[in-house]
């Protein structure tokens, strides 16, 4: 099972809300992800992960290590 930990990664970078994360993404990457997309990533609500969305978030947070944004657990 893959679990996104974008909420923890954002908090560690001083981002305290999804709105702040969205603003940072726009500022750093120029990409306007929908608020619902960010919410799904933040809350780990998707069964599928869009790689481009994940890379965009990682770029905005200046993260290069996938271990900072996801964990893999055995069922």
Name each region found by the language model.
Residues 24, 28, 60:
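Residues within the alpha-helical elements of helix-turn-helix
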Residues 1-24:
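A short, Lys/Arg-rich alpha-helix, primarily the initiator
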Residues 17-18, 35, 54:
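Helix-turn-helix DNA-binding elements, focusing on the entry/boundary residues of the two helices
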Residues 51-68:
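DNA major-groove recognition helix of helix-turn-helix/homeodomain DNA-binding modules
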């Amino acid at each position: 099972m893959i679990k996104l930990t974008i909420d923890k990664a954002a908090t560690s970078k001083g981002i305290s809300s999804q709105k702040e994360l969205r603003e940072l993404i726009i500022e750093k990457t120029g990409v306007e992800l929908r608020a619902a997309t960010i919410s799904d990533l933040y809350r780990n609500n998707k069964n599928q992960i869009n790689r481009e969305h994940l890379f965009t978030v990682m770029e905005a947070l200046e993260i290069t290590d996938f271990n900072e944004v996801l964990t893999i657990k055995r069922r």
